Design a protein with these regions (language model features):
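A short secondary-structure junction motif
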Residues: 22-26, 73, 77-80, 126-134
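An amphipathic alpha-helix adjacent to DNA-recognition modules
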Residues: 5-28, 32
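Short secondary-structure transition hinges
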Residues: 51-95, 143
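Short acidic/histidine-centered micro-motifs embedded in hydrophobic/aromatic stretches
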Residues: 18, 69-73, 118, 122
């Protein structure tokens, strides 16, 4: 298998690539109606664009495995998922960063990027961890929370982190 993909990195890239175009497209759909003139609604929609494309994979065949894989790669690979996807299916993520910066004019751009990196890691880790626990049959931690409530709570946490207050 490594020969076919050229290397372990090539294999990881191919597996990530498999769904990233779809995730990017879905994020754009969710961002279409973001209106910076209505900051609270805009931040909510941005948070949904960060969570829902991944959360929707919870009900897709093989989606749970993919989510656990992305979480594992994010926290154990030599390169971050961000580096692996830079310039490939990440334009919606750049759009999210632009929108959040627009809504957080008083916050320095490096702090906006930091917050976005933290919430992205939160999304990937939390969904991956929930799926790992769920697939192992353990109903502890986040695996005890129903899917809809889990997603809603994750979106709410992201809104809280990205809100401009306290900038």
């Amino acid at each position: 298998m490594q020969y076919y993909f050229g290397s372990k990195t090539g294999l990881i890239d191919a597996l990530l690539e498999r769904r990233m175009e779809e995730l990017n497209r879905r994020r754009y759909e969710l961002l279409d109606d973001v209106d910076p003139e209505h900051p609270a609604r805009a931040l909510r929609r941005i948070a949904e664009a960060m969570v829902l494309p991944f959360a929707e994979h919870l009900s897709v065949e093989g989606g749970s495995s993919y989510l656990r894989f992305v979480a594992q790669v994010t926290f154990s690979a030599d390169r971050s998922v961000f580096e692996m996807m830079r310039g490939r299916h990440d334009s919606a993520v750049r759009r999210i960063a632009d929108l959040v910066q627009q809504l957080s004019r008083d916050r320095r751009p490096d702090l906006v990027r930091h917050r976005l990196a933290v919430v992205t890691n939160l999304v990937l880790f939390t969904i991956g961890e929930r799926e790992k626990l769920r697939m192992s049959g353990r109903r502890t931690g986040v695996a005890r929370i129903g899917t809809a409530e889990f997603i809603e709570d994750l979106v709410a946490m992201i809104v809280d982190v990205l809100e401009p207050h306290g900038a």
